[in-house]
Amino acid sequence: MELIKEKIKKGKKFRWWILIVSIVVCFIAAWPFYQLITLSLRDVTDFESRLRFPKVLVWENYVTLLKGSEIWIGFKNSIIYSGLTVLIEIICASMAGYSLSRGSRNTTKAIRTIQMLIIMVPGIITLVGTYSLMIKFGLTNNLVALAFLTAAGGIPSCSFIYMNFINSIPVSLDEAARIDGAGVGSTFFRIILPQLLPITVTRAIMIGIGAWNNYLMPLYLLNDSRKKTVILIIRSAFSMTGGDRNLAMACATCTVGILPVIVVYMLLQRKIIESQIGSSIKG
């Protein structure tokens, strides 16, 4: 009995330590957002201490930002770029995953090995070559070309995830569809793809967030101010921080720019976690 009580006591102490560590981690994660928001709401005369909460909340930076056209151009370009990236990557990766799942074992193994080698290569290594090709073919300042390029980088890993999910779908469904006269394409789009809705929704969210936050490729390939994404608008705002007034405006730009991503992730985080758990179990 004493041994049980001692174990319960140790368990309670352990839970308290977990709680304390969790609070510290949450504080560290939330602190940059607190600084970002409070700096964006400060008056020019209220920058003596940047750690404390502002004396008066000043919304002028947000009003000025939202009245201008630059941030809205950035939103439009980011939506086009992210949407196209999601569409291209989901379609190509799901079809590739289906082909790998239903293909011959030797061919699938060889392609998976090539995929793993591609995934292991850091994207920064191919940056110079990619940039040269895009210039040669006149594809700079082109959101569609940038979307294809971004999607191509994510297809190997995404198709691998789709393959694991499709492996859990009985082959008998394919055979029944073939007996009814359906071809490979019809079988995939009418039978298999609807079964992949949970992972498709989750992957679409993750791909969209990744494209929205993509900085390196848009920085090199989008030089036209009319083609800049939100991330590049934020970069431009911080590059002009010559004083406290400009810093407050830059923080306001950053807050508005990242807000859609945070809202989407908070609303759909349960689906994302459930899908990732399901993927690990199926894998």
Where are these regions (language model features)?
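N-terminal Lys/Arg-rich, disordered targeting/topogenic segments
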Residues: 1-5
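A structural signal for multi-pass alpha-helical bundles of membrane permease subunits
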Residues: 6-10, 14-283
